[in-house]
């Protein structure tokens, strides 16, 4: 099977959480270093963003807005003020999507957006397999002053069938 074809398969959150875990920790630590106390942060429902939560817990007076079902519980456990987007739940990735999620995001202006994807092509296209999750990510990027892609090495050079944005549309890409 083609390596790019494998990236088109929806892998459940609980399995993805274990993949590239050391690399995700390095990326999460770097990403959290951008966030000063008192920031408002969008986190998507990716496992890479989820790994940031313990590092964000070291900050004071944050507000984190997320469409991640599992992220909400972790944020609460870490005593971080959190807002869930609500919406329809995609069970495989534990993400809220849909019009309710988009409306909630549009009500806020965040300082930062941290998100992940399934593919970052050599020409800078950021892609994923989930159109509904991409819509949520796009709305987060639109309503954040700065947006960063959290990118593990397995995503580089891959292209999935739904375009999210390009590297030129965001502030930066954080890698291990």
Name each region found by the language model:
Residues 1-42, 53-58, 73-80:
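HTH-adjacent hinge/linker in prokaryotic transcriptional regulators
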Residues 18-22, 26, 47, 59, ...:
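Residues at secondary-structure transition points
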Residues 38, 59-61, 144, 170:
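A general structural motif
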Residues 43-44, 66, 175:
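Short beta-strand scaffold positions
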Residues 62-65, 82:
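Short beta-strand element of Class I
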Residues 70-176:
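Conserved phosphate- and dinucleotide-binding cores of soluble alpha/beta proteins
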